[in-house]
């Protein structure tokens, strides 16, 4: 009878764990663990098969999990290798999650809390921005989603956007941090090491995601401010979703060494070992 109880307990655990796996893998847009170890192209190991072309200065180094990319003088460019038709890179909602190891952190508070080191960046028009996620002023983080219409016009100061600037988070150079920005159409949120650090409601008339033919960059915003918006440091385990993750999912992603498996085998082995001692 006792053995039947523990078999049932294992079954319940397996069902619950598979449910978590389904939640964390649902909506993966691209996942780049950066474990190639060499070369100038990194692969999306998710279902869509995107790629990132690295800057000449980028190099593979020991990372948080396996290897990471060291950025210093220029960003990587995300591309859709499939020819023809509209790009599949564009989404309505968004989560960007990544491990960062910055070489430089500024304790200065800049005007409007703007950022100085872009982690993830896309431009929506000739002079306006669509998405910005990066290091912010005052040892903090910065998350920006633009507003507007499907056919983006040149920059208009009256455009509604949602900027979540979180200074004074205490970021220090040469430390690993797991950072996450989410946007679900109703609010934006920023997480640091699995903790929700801030959120902001989206204005009633915007913003929306404004994608076009402009490149998506990771590891810096090129050709602006004499390089001030280039990220200098390591990035590892970049995963982008086409939806906003929940807090529990953010923690699960942070604790995973492979988003596509969520360490199921290790969890099952550990749990079965505990059950056998009962």
Task: Describe each region flagged by the PLM.
Residues 7-19:
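Bacterial N-terminal signal peptides
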Residues 21-51, 61-245, 265, 269-278:
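Extracellular glycan-associated modules
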Residues 258-266:
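Feature responds to low-complexity, polar/acidic, surface-exposed segments characteristic
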Residues 1-7:
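Bacterial N-terminal signal peptides that target proteins for export
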Residues 202, 255-258:
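A generic structural signal for secondary-structure junctions
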